[in-house]
């Protein structure tokens, strides 16, 4: 491959202005992200801990292998919606490493509206299932949910890709032989009750986890009978009477250890092996991306200046260099992985795009001047990253996940 040479003037006034603006934007982004990942209100967090329950992120930390990263997905879902009462849409999703294998983790955050689902919660849950399905990754549900958020039920239930799709996906995952493990760590009411019932193996925590379609108040209203939540759908009932749950746990920590034991040898298809090469650092400092992205969005940027600061050794084998010149396509390596790159800085000629995309079984990095969109397909892992926020993604996705 040829080594790209930069024509960028890093001492120019424009570069310094761009860098200053985007460092400011990055700081703002990190501040919003931190606030959004704190969970519910301090009062809700305190009440959660009083019940001797671990927080959702603490549960994930215990599940994944020590000193391994957790690639969180959709962390800003629900941001600036519903008066920001649904940080991270009340659910944490991502990919972690359990016994050396990538595993999709979906954890309800009960400190946010009792772990209930509004429209963005549903979409975030579905997206995580889709990633598990397309990449044949084991799926772990850490269930602590009151089901649908009833004040917003008109936006949760009606659509094809709304609440019921979760259970459709569970059936498909099961049919594909992809393991699904549910840990019932709190309330599983109404729609939330179906998740553990449809999983391959279910763990339930004593005096804490409950599974029922309607709780004690509904039973009393319908039949006049008074029962406790534990009597109606607790760990003892579901492990010894109904058989809905398979494993009885004393507390959150015990439940997570049982889950790790189950995942020690899952029957799941081996992921595809990619031909990797030794890793090389880019010849140009990736932090220069701050100065490349223009403050004025109307100004175009040569995507090669971006590519040479991302790929190994700044080496790039361009494909169809003289055809549809507003699109740059080619091959490179990132962290030793073979990558196909598509970048545009003008009109996107779909004929060139389609020709390039017919190559199978490669990671695809799409650099688009106008939008940010993530795409996952069965035969390729495609990521679309806006030049405007590439500097933000660089230090989260690239450093944590590909390493």
Predicted regions and their residues:
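Amphipathic alpha-helical
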Residues: 51-77, 284-316
């Amino acid at each position: 491959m040829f080594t790209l040479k930069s024509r960028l003037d890093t001492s120019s006034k424009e570069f310094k202005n761009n860098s200053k603006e985007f460092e400011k934007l990055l700081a703002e982004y990190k501040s919003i992200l931190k606030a959004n990942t704190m969970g519910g209100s301090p009062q809700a967090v305190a009440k959660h801990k009083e019940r001797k329950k671990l927080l959702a992120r603490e549960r994930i930390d215990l599940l994944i292998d020590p000193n391994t990263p957790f690639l969180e997905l959709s962390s800003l879902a629900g941001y600036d919606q519903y008066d920001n009462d649904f940080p991270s849409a009340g659910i944490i999703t991502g990919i972690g490493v359990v016994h050396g294998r990538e595993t999709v983790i979906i954890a309800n955050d009960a400190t946010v509206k009792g772990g209930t689902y509004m429209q963005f919660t549903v979409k975030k849950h579905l997206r995580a299932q889709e990633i598990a399905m397309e990449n044949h990754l084991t799926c772990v549900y850490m269930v602590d949910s009151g089901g649908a958020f009833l004040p917003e039920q008109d936006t949760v239930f009606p659509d094809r890709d709304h609440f019921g799709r979760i259970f459709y996906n569970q059936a498909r995952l099961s049919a594909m032989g992809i393991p699904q493990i549910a840990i019932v760590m709190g309330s599983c009411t109404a729609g939330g009750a179906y998740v553990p019932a449809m999983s391959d193996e279910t763990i339930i925590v004593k005096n804490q986890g409950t599974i029922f379609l309607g709780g004690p108040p509904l039973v009393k209203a319908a039949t006049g009978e008074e029962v406790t939540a534990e009597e109606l759908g607790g760990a003892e009932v579901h492990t010894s009477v109904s058989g809905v749950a398979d494993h009885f746990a004393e507390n959150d920590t015990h439940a997570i250890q049982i889950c790790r034991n189950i995942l020690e040898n899952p029957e799941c298809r081996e992921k595809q092996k990619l031909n990797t090469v030794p890793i090389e650092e880019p010849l140009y400092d990736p932090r220069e991306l701050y100065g490349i992205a223009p403050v004025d969005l109307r100004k175009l940027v040569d995507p090669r200046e971006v590519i040479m600061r991302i790929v190994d050794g700044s080496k790039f084998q361009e494909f169809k260099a003289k055809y549809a010149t507003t699109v740059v396509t080619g091959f490179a390596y990132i962290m030793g992985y073979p990558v196909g790159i598509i970048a545009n800085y003008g009109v996107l000629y779909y004929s060139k795009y389609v020709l390039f995309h017919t190559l199978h079984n490669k990671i695809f990095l799409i650099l688009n001047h106008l939008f940010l969109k993530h795409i996952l397909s069965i035969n390729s892992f495609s990521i679309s990253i806006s030049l405007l926020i590439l500097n933000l993604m660089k230090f989260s996705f690239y450093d944590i996940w590909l390493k």
